[in-house]
Structure formats: structure tokens, C-alpha cells
């Protein structure tokens, strides 16, 4: 049984992007001394432009539901999921806004999550985005994937109570980006935080430099004017 023991052992837990010891360099202080987070990174014009352009481009692409038959595949506009994906995934969002939101999450955090809402018969009736920075991917005692979501200041109307909630794989639409285990993606912002930190530092230095020049010129102009007034007063009889 020794040769086959490796085939039947349980899979390792997913390498969670946010609390894994091997990924302690997630959002945080860069070598430039600047703290790089999802919010500060988006204030950098290059990061914001990339996220905006890619998110809007993906959100504009056509999204249809197909089924396979003996001739290949055909579009199925009457399928129940067609309306959710193509038109309105939930009463608060259009398909464009929903896909734009998920794509921006994927670009910033490396993962995009959406809660799958079902009716009593098990039919999917809604999709709501979940914030990736509040999600932890793990395995339960039966080695099943679980999603532990922290409900603090939550905007999702389906998660009203505060605290942690456990969602199973059939309750979450998870789109991971590039990662080492194929389950959890790594944040592009975190991986490039030193480059972004340098850009933020340069922007702040430039703004401070030009701000000091303006103040210096104002001070020089003030003293020039004040000095000329004093001179004219002293020369008066």
C-alpha cells in the first residue's frame, strides 16, 4: 500500500492570498517606505487606468449561454441563466456593472467572488459580488472546499448579520487569477507593490517640490512688496 498511499492522501489546504505565511508580502509597506494598499494603489493614475480599461473592456464583451448538440453548439436565450448573465444578475446591478466589478476585483486582489442565490428548488436566481479581502478559502473536515466570509459593514443584502459565515463551493462563483495551487490567485498589486510604491513616492515628492516652489515665490513676492512699502514710508518727509 506504500506506493499508493500518496495517491489517496487528502489535498493540501489552499494557499490563501491574505493570511498564508508564504505570502506575507501582500498589501503593505514597500521598500520605498510607502504603504501600498488596494485604495492607495488605485490613486496612482497608471493603476487606475489599467483597472478601468480592462474591467470595462471585459464587461462590454457579449455573454451568452450555449448548449451542445449533435451539430455543435447553439445559443439558448430561453435558459434561466441567460437573463442573469446577459441582463441582470441581481436587482441592484446590470450585467455590465456586475462583470466590471468582478473584473476589477480580479485585477486588484487576484480573485473574484460572487454569492450564488438559489430558490427552494435549487434554481439559481441571483449573483451578488463578495469582497475578496473579506474571503478566506479553506477545507473542512471532509476535505471539501469552503469559503469563510467576514460580514463586517457588508453591502450584500443577503448577508445582513455581522460575523463569519461559511459558504460551500456550490454557493460561490470563484474566479481565481494566477496562483500556485490553482485555487487561490495572487494579487497583481501585491506582487508589484515596490514598483507602485516608487511611483507613489515620486508623485508625492513632485507635488511637495512644486508646492514648496509656489510657497517660496509667494513669500519672496510678499517680502518684496513689504520691503518697497517700508522704503517708501521711510523716505516720506
Question: Residue locations for each model-derived region?
Answer:
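Structured, contiguous alpha/beta core segments that scaffold functional sites
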Residues: 1-237
Amino acid at each position: 500500500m506504500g506506493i499508493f498511499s500518496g495517491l489517496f492522501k487528502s489535498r493540501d489546504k489552499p494557499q490563501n492570498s491574505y493570511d498564508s505565511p508564504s505570502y506575507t508580502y501582500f498589501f503593505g509597506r514597500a521598500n520605498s517606505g510607502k504603504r501600498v494598499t488596494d485604495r492607495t494603489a488605485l490613486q496612482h493614475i497608471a493603476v487606475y487606468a489599467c483597472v478601468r480599461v480592462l474591467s470595462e473592456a471585459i464587461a462590454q464583451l457579449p455573454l451568452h449561454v450555449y448548449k451542445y448538440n449533435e451539430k455543435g453548439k447553439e445559443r439558448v436565450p430561453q435558459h434561466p441563466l441567460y437573463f442573469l448573465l446577459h441582463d441582470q444578475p441581481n436587482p441592484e446591478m446590470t450585467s455590465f456593472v456586475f462583470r466590471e466589478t468582478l473584473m476589477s476585483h480580479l485585477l486588484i486582489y487576484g480573485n473574484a467572488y460572487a454569492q450564488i442565490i438559489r430558490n427552494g428548488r435549487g434554481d439559481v436566481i441571483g449573483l451578488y459580488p463578495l469582497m475578496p479581502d473579506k474571503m478566506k478559502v479553506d477545507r473542512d473536515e471532509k476535505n471539501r472546499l469552503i469559503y469563510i466570509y467576514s460580514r463586517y459593514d457588508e453591502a450584500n443584502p443577503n448577508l445582513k448579520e455581522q460575523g463569519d459565515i461559511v459558504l460551500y463551493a456550490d454557493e460561490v462563483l470563484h474566479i481565481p487569477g494566477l496562483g500556485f495551487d490553482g485555487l487561490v490567485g495572487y494579487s497583481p498589486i501585491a506582487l508589484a507593490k515596490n514598483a507602485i510604491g516608487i511611483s507613489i513616492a515620486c508623485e508625492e515628492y513632485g507635488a511637495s517640490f512644486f508646492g514648496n516652489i509656489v510657497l517660496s515665490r509667494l513669500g519672496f513676492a510678499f517680502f518684496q512688496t513689504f520691503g518697497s512699502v517700508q522704503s517708501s514710508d521711510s523716505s516720506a518727509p
